[in-house]
Amino acid sequence: MKALVENLKATARETDATDIRAAFAADPNRFSRFSTAFDDLLFDYSKCAVNDRIIDGLEALAKAAKVEEKRDAMFRGDIINITEERAVLHTALRNRSNRPVLVDGKDVMPDVNAVLEAMGKFADDIRSGALKGATGKKITDVVNIGIGGSDLGPVMATLALAPFHDGPRLHFVSNVDGAHIADTLTLLDPETSLFIVASKTFTTIETMTNAATARAFIAGKLGEAAVGHHFAAVSTALDKVGAFGIDAARVFGFWDWVGGRYSIWSAIGLPLMIAIGKENFGRFLDGGHAIDEHFRSAPLRQNIPMLLGLIGFYNRNVLGYPSRAILPYDQRLTRFPAYLQQLDMESNGKGVTLDSQPVEFSTGPVVWGEPGTNGQHAFYQLIHQGTDVIPAEFMIAANGHEKDLRHQHQLLMANCLAQSEALMKGRTLAEAKAQLTSKGMDDAKADKIAPHRVFTGNRPSLTIVYDQLDPFALGRLIALYEHRVFVEGALFNINSFDQWGVELGKELATGLLPVIEGKESAEGHDSSTAGLVAALLKAAR
């Protein structure tokens, strides 16, 4: 693998692959040769620093890393999360073919379908008013209490699919900061509110702290007996859920082969289903399944997740770019960059291989971004003229949902395409000076100002185009990036499905809480931590 990466570095130098502008000038067919489509989903990577020899080298890299074999092992239900000894089967949750998926010799699809059916019945009953609050009033507001994968996915998808909302209002509480739950409760009528507590073990400290506050809100306003009417849970800890006061009929489970950041397809997606209805949720699953089938069957050069992963690895380890910007030109995808940040950085932010050896490559890049056009007035300056090259990943729909505002969507599309073109083309010193002198500036002043208006260009970007942001399209986008993360993890030869860095933070916070509460001394902690504890306790009221 290391030798193949070094060969790719040599090829990139020999072919001047990073001169993307020259590549377009030399090849009028570059777009058609370095783009591919799956139904209405278009993937354009012609503005990336690649050529035929680079793609050949990346294909050889994928074969050497056995990416396709690892992919097949995941879909087969093999134990690929080796540190937790688990299969990785979020794909089974959206397996619309209903082909058997075996874990330990047992087909999981009957259980998957049973939970999906129970979710649908519960969502229908909440939406129709068949299930009411303790005082007989229809539920108008649903609050999801979770954190991490139990929050980011539902929040992102609910915002993305706002045009399809025809159910109760949705709210999300995640942060243990009391301001989050307090601000949400001020918006609610306890008689018409339902809380969904999303925690597989029902022990997640942030979630259970917020759930206790919500429980006190209902019990205090409506009485202890009302609690069961105003809560549901997504959990497998039936005993703990029961002790909390939630009836087993209102508990929806999922499995240890579903990681939190991959769980939007599971019962964690219940709030989304309540918002958009079970039929639209089904279309969401259909979109994810469509990408699964494409990922499993398409040849590498037409396989969008495979290409996306290979280009990501290439940008990080051949060209040395340390981050990537996710830039959806779709306001309703406002939380999609944050969702992908968790998906990518929690999955591939690892330093040890599957063989328990140090990784020989640079692993997950920093993933960040904002929707366009907002980002253009914030951080695009750095992408265009900063000293680091930051590959950009644009997303744009051909159609918005606001038919009477078509002119605004046209402006949005123009901005998206203009940014990708500008990143590639740039502006030379001569062009910058000519622009200034054409406006009447004298040569001496233009010579001084022009360097500030130079754009080096050759900044790589890729663009994903889809028809319209609907449940099916969103399902495809999420699955596309899930599999991209898988491909990169396979190339790194790491376990993309554990998260011991997250667990470390939980352990340390649990140990420090008694010190913050004043029950234990800070002795044994470093001087910085002890000093910060002392300062906080001194100022606390």
Swiss-Prot record:
Main location group: cytoplasm
Protein name, UniProt field: Glucose-6-phosphate isomerase
Location in the cell: Cytoplasm
Organism in which the protein naturally occurs: Rhizobium meliloti (strain 1021) (Ensifer meliloti)
Pathway: Carbohydrate biosynthesis; gluconeogenesis; Carbohydrate degradation; glycolysis; D-glyceraldehyde 3-phosphate and glycerone phosphate from D-glucose: step 2/4
Record GO cellular component, one term: cytosol
CDD domains linked: SIS_PGI_1, SIS_PGI_2
InterPro entries registered for this protein in UniProt: G6P_Isomerase (IPR001672), G6P_Isomerase_C (IPR023096), Phosphoglucose_isomerase_CS (IPR018189), SIS_dom_sf (IPR046348), SIS_PGI_1 (IPR035476), SIS_PGI_2 (IPR035482)
Catalytic activity: alpha-D-glucose 6-phosphate = beta-D-fructose 6-phosphate
